[in-house]
């Protein structure tokens, strides 16, 4: 069975791309009565507030018709930002050599939180250099992953 996020991504990909943007990813966070649906978009020239507002209107219209979420939620549309979340193998592969932090469902090397440089991505497996040690993590074990911004 597909996750809610994957069903939403499938539903929203075409309308977002029709506006000229890439659907970077989706997060749905249930927090009691105040759930949040975050839709991340990206574009060749970046994203501005007007892009987010236009995309929000389009996404909201699709969600109103399809009604995939039965509870109340707040819709947020934004750029992934400098500490962008990573959702797919392709996104992780694009950041080989960069530092990331990942939160895991099941511990690897005794930890559910890892920080390290991506050394490679093969299929659905991510290799990280964590404090000089090579660790391999299945992408489906990653609850959340983000690029660590360098300033």
Swiss-Prot record:
One GO CC term on file? cytosol
Q: Where in the cell is it found?
A: Cytoplasm
* Gene3D superfamilies named among the record's database cross-references: Ribosome maturation factor RimP, C-terminal domain, RimP-like superfamily, N-terminal
Any Pfam family from its record, for instance, is RimP_N
The UniProt keywords, alphabetically, are: Cytoplasm, Ribosome biogenesis
**SUPFAM superfamilies, alphabetized:** YhbC-like, C-terminal domain (SSF74942), YhbC-like, N-terminal domain (SSF75420)
Q: Does the keyword Cytoplasm apply?
A: yes
Keyword Cytoplasm appears in the UniProt entry: yes
Instruction: State the Gene Ontology BP annotations.
Output: ribosomal small subunit assembly; translation
Family, per entry: Belongs to the RimP family.
The record's function comment reads: Required for maturation of 30S ribosomal subunits.
Name of the protein: Ribosome maturation factor RimP
Taxonomy, top ranks, is: Bacteria, Pseudomonadati, Pseudomonadota, Gammaproteobacteria, Alteromonadales
Gene, per the UniProt record:
rimP
């Amino acid at each position: 069975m597909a996750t809610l996020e994957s069903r939403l991504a499938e539903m929203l990909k075409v309308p977002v791309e029709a506006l000229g943007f890439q659907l970077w990813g989706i997060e749905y966070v249930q927090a009691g009565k105040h759930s949040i649906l975050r839709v991340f978009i990206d574009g060749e020239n970046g994203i501005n507030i007007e892009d987010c507002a236009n995309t929000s209107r389009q996404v909201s219209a699709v969600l109103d018709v399809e009604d995939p979420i039965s509870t109340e939620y707040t819709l947020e549309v934004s750029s992934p930002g400098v500490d962008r979340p990573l959702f797919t193998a392709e996104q992780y592969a694009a950041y080989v050599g960069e530092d990331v932090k990942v939160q895991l469902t099941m511990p690897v090397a005794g930890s559910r939180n890892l920080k390290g440089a991506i050394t490679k991505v093969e299929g659905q497996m991510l290799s990280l250099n964590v404090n000089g040690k090579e660790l391999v993590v299945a992408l489906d074990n990653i609850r959340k992953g983000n690029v660590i911004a360098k300033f």
